């Protein structure tokens, strides 16, 4: 089974970009560019998923992961 994570992007007043993985509450990251914010939040999401797998908090649905920037 595969899981697709949605990434929402928003530009802050100071010019930085914030990216958030909608399906993983609290998983958000800043970047100077959209691409940097996306890369940062993808890396963080993978860490969260790895931690959940390591602690048996996630099922097999995390075996195939896809990211889609909105």
Label every PLM stretch briefly:
Residues 25-36:
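A short, exposed loop/beta-hairpin motif centered on an aromatic-Gly-Thr core
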Residues 1-6, 35-70:
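Short, charged, surface-exposed hinge/linker loops at domain edges
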Residues 21-24, 42:
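ATP/adenylate-binding site constellation spanning eukaryotic-like Ser/Thr protein kinases
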Residues 5, 23-26:
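Short amphipathic alpha-helical segments
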Residues 10-22:
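Short aromatic-glycine-(Arg/Gly/Cys) micro-motifs in beta-strand/loop hairpins
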């Amino acid at each position: 089974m595969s899981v697709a994570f949605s990434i929402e992007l928003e530009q802050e007043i100071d010019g930085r970009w914030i990216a958030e993985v909608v399906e993983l509450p609290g998983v958000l990251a800043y970047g100077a560019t959209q691409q940097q914010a996306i890369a940062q939040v993808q890396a963080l999401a993978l860490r969260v998923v790895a931690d959940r797998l390591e602690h048996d908090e996630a099922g097999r649905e995390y075996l195939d992961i896809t990211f889609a920037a909105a």
